[in-house]
């Protein structure tokens, strides 16, 4: 309640009278609220009750952009403008695993390929904690709380969003180099030089993240976002012309290899973007890729949908970071943000008026890009756990898809080792304390 304008007004009217402030905060009066069925509604309730009601809504922001021009084709700032004026497209939130794009892009810059391997294993390091102002031990974990111990191609690690591999790559490539690459691709927000940046610990906004992914979709060429292309006065005289400049932010070879990584999110076994096939599977004349992202405590859920001529990004989260889902069953990017992008892409690609957005990334143009750099055996674990908590599609079983998105086989919970089933049950128990809304 202390964050609301009415509290400051009451504080000025009743200085040193906390009982009076509490009385008026709990006194019923006419309040405007939001309802999904009716939109804006009026009710006679107290300010405290209105906060308890409104704060529970999950919010959404969405952007669609053309990679070749930077033209913003869709911009949705929130679920209802009358109730929430703040534009969530510009909100600063942790990008989670969507930031791994820059880690892997820099890895490709430095000569690695999607078929190079790294091991998914325990890693620990000493880092400086700014809040505690001391050196602490940081042990990043995977979303499912375990490590396979296996060596896997980078294309599999990216598709499955393996945190341990991303952190290790961050140390190998250098965080400063990753920051430089992210800035060249379109990230303008300040990024902290810390190992956790590889997992998306620094805040960014939706617009710049979408713009950066467009750089990869556009073969490494970066365009600034364009909202207005041209303005004329009443006499038809041009008074403004939108920017049409572009620059090669990352080499073509790097962009091509990262495109393969993004498509692998839908094609690799256990890829966290596989459920996008349910929305765009009918449009085989177009290449699709994606990357999910989820921040700590499921406070932010992201999905980046990528095609050669259209890039979309959705964010879902609470008004405050303390408002979030308790588990990954609903809180992951694949569960909340991916369907938003999926329905939008489906509506675009089924419309004959938008045939210009169909197309494939194409074969490599450079002779030094060989097939063995990006076409290699996928990683198949010996036994698979429920990937609901790893930004994956989840469900009763795990669907394994081939390179064209067709099911190969299904691994059911019965295929899990008994010890792993027990671990899953333990992980599924919520341990988070319930939120006290009165403290807002």
Pin down the residues of each PLM region:
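Extended, hydrophobic alpha-helical segments in both membrane/secreted and soluble proteins
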Residues: 72-73, 80, 85, 95-108, ...
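Mid-domain, small-residue-enriched loop/turn segments at the edges of structured enzyme/sensor domains
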Residues: 132-140, 172-211, 220, 224-225
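A penicillin-recognizing enzyme superfamily signal
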Residues: 1-66, 75-76, 81-88, 99, ...
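Active-site SXXK
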Residues: 69-70, 92-120, 126, 157, ...
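Low-complexity, Gly/Ser/Thr/Pro-rich intrinsically disordered linker/tail segments
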Residues: 370-440
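Conserved catalytic neighborhood of penicillin-recognizing serine enzymes
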Residues: 112-176, 222, 234-259, 263
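C-terminal substrate/ligand-recognition segments
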Residues: 55-72, 99, 105, 109, ...
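Hydrophobic "anchor" residues
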Residues: 71-72, 238, 407
């Amino acid at each position: 309640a202390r964050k609301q304008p009415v509290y400051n007004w009451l504080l000025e009217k009743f200085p040193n009278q906390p009982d009076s402030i509490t009385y008026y905060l709990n006194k019923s009066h006419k309040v405007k609220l939001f309802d999904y069925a009716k939109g804006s509604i009026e009710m006679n309730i107290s300010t405290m009750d209105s906060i308890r009601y409104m704060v529970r809504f999950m919010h959404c922001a969405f952007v669609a952009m053309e990679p070749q021009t930077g033209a913003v084709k869709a911009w949705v700032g929130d679920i209802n403008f009358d109730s929430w004026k703040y534009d969530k497209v510009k909100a600063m939130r942790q990008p989670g695993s969507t930031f791994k794009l820059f880690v892997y892009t820099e890895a490709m810059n430095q000569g690695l390929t999607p078929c190079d391997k790294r091991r998914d294993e325990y890693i620990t390091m000493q880092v400086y904690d700014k809040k505690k102002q001391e050196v602490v031990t940081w042990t990043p974990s995977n979303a499912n709380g375990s490590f396979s111990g296996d060596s896997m191609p980078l294309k599999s690690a990216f598709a499955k969003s393996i945190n341990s591999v991303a952190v290790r790559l961050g140390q190998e490539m250098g965080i400063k180099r990753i920051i430089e690459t992210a800035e060249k691709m379109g990230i303008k927000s300040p990024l902290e030089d810390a190992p956790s940046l590889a997992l998306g610990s620094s805040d960014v906004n939706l617009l710049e993240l979408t713009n950066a992914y467009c750089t990869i979709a556009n073969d490494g060429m970066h365009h600034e976002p364009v909202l207005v292309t041209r303005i004329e006065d009443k006499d038809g005289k041009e008074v403004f012309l939108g920017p049409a400049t572009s620059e090669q932010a990352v080499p073509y070879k790097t962009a091509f290899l990262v495109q393969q990584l993004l498509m692998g999110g839908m094609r690799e076994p256990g890829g966290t973007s596989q459920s996008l096939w349910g929305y765009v599977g009918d449009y085989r004349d177009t290449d699709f890729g994606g990357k999910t992202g989820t921040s700590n405590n499921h406070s932010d859920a992201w999905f980046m949908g990528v095609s050669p001529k259209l890039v979309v990004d959705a964010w879902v989260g609470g008004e405050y970071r303390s408002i979030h889902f308790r588990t990954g069953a609903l809180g992951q990017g694949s569960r909340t943000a991916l369907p938003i992008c999926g329905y939008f892409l489906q509506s675009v690609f089924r419309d004959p008026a938008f045939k210009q957005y169909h197309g494939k990334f194409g074969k490599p143009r450079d002779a030094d890009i060989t097939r063995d750099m990006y076409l290699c055996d996928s990683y198949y674990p010996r036994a698979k756990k429920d990937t609901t908590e790893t930004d994956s599609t989840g469900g009763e079983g795990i669907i394994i898809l081939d390179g064209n998105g067709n099911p190969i086989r299904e691994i059911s919970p019965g295929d899990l080792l008994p010890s792993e089933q027990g671990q899953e049950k333990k992980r599924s128990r919520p341990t988070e304390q319930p939120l006290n809304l009165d403290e807002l």
